[in-house]
């Protein structure tokens, strides 16, 4: 490689060349195959909304993941700065930035996993559904580009309200003829992370050793922790069950209020999103028994979408697990969750079909 090519390679994150021109004139790297020199083969990951409150820590943590060989960072503003900053980290993933709608398709071409934290954050007094009118349109636009440029990629949706944005993405993919229920997942991992943490606090355990299934959806009463199925098995009083359920359901509000208008749960959300993305990549690699909770197309209930345990594999979701035995408190919670979820799903589908 001559010096000009080396310089072009190093500075590509600041002003990514057009993919079609690159192929036509044979200069620079083939973006689809680019990888750090000496880096081990891995997966190509795009983050849409990479310059936001969730996107920045998410991008940093994904740059640290050894399973990532190429990391594309897209946003409508500030993407070059975030990309330049993260690209200085001495890990093997090649980082490239993409700015604005004209570069969206190039950002998505050839990706194995697309993570979407794009959208506006919650502020005090706002519910996740208050975000709907802004974030629904963003998710629809991004999903249309995914359907065109990387229809076989696994898609992780973080943008709230997840209960509605996942159905929106599904409808866009159906319209494009690319919908694969195994590859579309709403990220509810933060509910699981919170549940593990709060249960560990109550029971004086190491949170890394606690597993709490959280099913339903990703907002308020649709978040249903199955405390009867905690591992290791724990015995809770009714007061503890009610306290834990309420705190898990309102963990996001707790952070929004604590930040007093300065943001929402960005850092813990980025951590949870990376945990889930890593599980998806390990599944793609062929690792066995990768089981996490996610909001997916489902037959577990009568609703078309529902969060439950899923087993991840080379094609995305290999299996969607049922709920298992529920106690009376959980059965009552399930009925409340389904009622609200049904409205949110319908809202998303209706928006996408307009």
Curated annotation (Swiss-Prot):
Its top-level enzyme class, in one word, is: oxidoreductase
Give residues annotated as binding substrate.
122, 128, 160, 194
Name the positions where NAD(+) binds. Answer: 49-55, 75, 135, 158-160, 269
Per UniProt, subcellular location reads as: Peroxisome
Could you tell me which InterPro entries the record lists for this protein?
L-lactate/malate_DH, Lactate/malate_DH_C, Lactate/malate_DH_N, Lactate_DH/Glyco_Ohase_4_C, Malate_DH_AS, Malate_DH_type1, NAD(P)-bd_dom_sf
Would the keyword Oxidoreductase turn up in this protein's UniProt record? yes
Q: What happens when the gene is disrupted?
A: No visible phenotype under normal growth conditions, but the double mutant plants pmdh1 and pmdh2 show seedling growth arrest 5 days after seed imbibition.
| Its EC number(s) | 1.1.1.37
Coiled-coil residue windows: none
Annotated catalytic residues: 218
Name the organs or tissues of expression: Expressed in rosette leaves at low levels.
MF terms from GO for this chain are: L-malate dehydrogenase (NAD+) activity
Please give the residue ranges the record annotates as the region Peroxisomal targeting signal PTS2: 6-14
Q: Which CDD domains match?
A: MDH_glyoxysomal_mitochondrial
Classify the source by domain of life. Eukaryota
What's the family? Answer: Belongs to the LDH/MDH superfamily. MDH type 1 family.
Its assembly, as annotated, is:
Homodimer.
| Its job | Catalyzes a reversible NAD-dependent dehydrogenase reaction involved in central metabolism and redox homeostasis between organelle compartments. Peroxisomal NAD-dependent malate dehydrogenase involved in fatty acid beta-oxidation. Reoxidizes NADH from the beta-oxidation and provides NAD for the conversion of fatty acyl-CoA to acetyl-CoA. Does not participate directly in the glyoxylate cycle. Required for maintenance of photosynthetic rates under photorespiratory conditions, and carbon flow during photorespiration.
The name this protein carries in UniProt is Malate dehydrogenase 1, peroxisomal
Organism this protein belongs to: Arabidopsis thaliana (Mouse-ear cress)
């Amino acid at each position: 490689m001559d010096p000009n090519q080396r310089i072009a390679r190093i500075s590509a994150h600041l002003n990514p060349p057009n993919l079609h021109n690159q192929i036509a004139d044979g200069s620079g790297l083939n973006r689809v195959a680019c990888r750090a020199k000496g880096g081990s083969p891995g997966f190509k990951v795009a983050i849409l909304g990479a310059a936001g409150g969730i996107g920045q820590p998410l991008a940093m943590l994904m740059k640290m993941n050894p399973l990532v060989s190429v990391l594309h960072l897209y946003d409508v503003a500030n993407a070059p700065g975030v990309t330049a900053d993260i690209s200085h980290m001495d890990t093997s993933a090649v980082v490239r930035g993409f700015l604005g709608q004209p570069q969206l398709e190039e950002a998505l071409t050839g990706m194995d996993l697309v993570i979407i934290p794009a959208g506006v954050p919650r502020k005090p007094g706002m519910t996740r559904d208050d975000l709907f009118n802004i974030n629904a349109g963003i998710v629809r636009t991004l999903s249309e580009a995914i359907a065109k440029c990387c229809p076989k990629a696994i898609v992780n949706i973080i943008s709230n309200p997840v209960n509605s944005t996942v159905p929106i993405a599904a409808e866009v993919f159906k319209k494009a003829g690319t919908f694969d229920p195994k590859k579309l997942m709403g990220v509810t991992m933060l509910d699981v992370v919170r549940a593990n943490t709060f249960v560990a606090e109550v029971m004086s355990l190491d949170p890394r050793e606690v597993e709490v299934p959280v099913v339903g959806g990703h907002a308020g009463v649709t978040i249903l922790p199955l405390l009867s199925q905690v591992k290791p098995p724990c015995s809770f009083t009714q007061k503890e069950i009610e306290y834990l359920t309420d705190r898990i359901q309102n963990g996001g509000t707790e952070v929004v209020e604590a930040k007093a208008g300065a943001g929402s749960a960005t850092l813990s959300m980025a951590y949870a999103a990376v945990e889930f993305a890593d599980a998806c990549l390990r599944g793609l690699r062929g690792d066995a028994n990768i089981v996490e909770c996610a909001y997916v197309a489902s037959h577990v209930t009568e609703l078309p979408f529902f969060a439950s345990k899923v087993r991840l594999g080379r094609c995305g979701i290999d299996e969607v697990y049922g709920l298992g035995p529920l106690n009376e408190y959980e059965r009552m919670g399930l009925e409340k969750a389904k009622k609200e979820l049904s409205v949110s799903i319908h809202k998303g589908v209706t928006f996408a079909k307009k």
